[in-house]
Amino acid sequence: MSLEFSPPFNEVTQNLNETIEFEKELSLAELIEFFGLKYGEKFTDLVWEKGNKGVFSKYLSIIINGRSYQHDKFLETKLKDGDQIVFIYIYFGG
C-alpha cells in the first residue's frame, strides 16, 4: 500500500511518501491507529477534531485510490495491497 502525506502530515512523518505492507487487509481505522502508534499524538491530533476522537478534522480529506469520500462506515473501509492512500489537509484563505 502506498501513502502520500501532504502538509502538515509530512512534517510529522518526515516523509512525503511511504510504502507499507500488511499480512492481511485492514480497515482505515486500523491504519490510522497504526500511524498513531508509529508517529504519536501529533499525527492523531491532525486526524481527529480536537477533543473528539472518532470525528474527522474538518480540514482532513483522505483519498483512497483517487476517490475522496466519507460515509457512516468510512472508518470500516477495507484497505488492501496496492491501494493508494493520501492524507491531505484542505486550507482556504487568502
Q: What is the meaning of each model-derived region?
A:
Residues 1-93:
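Ubiquitin-like/PB1-type beta-grasp interaction modules and other compact soluble beta-rich domains
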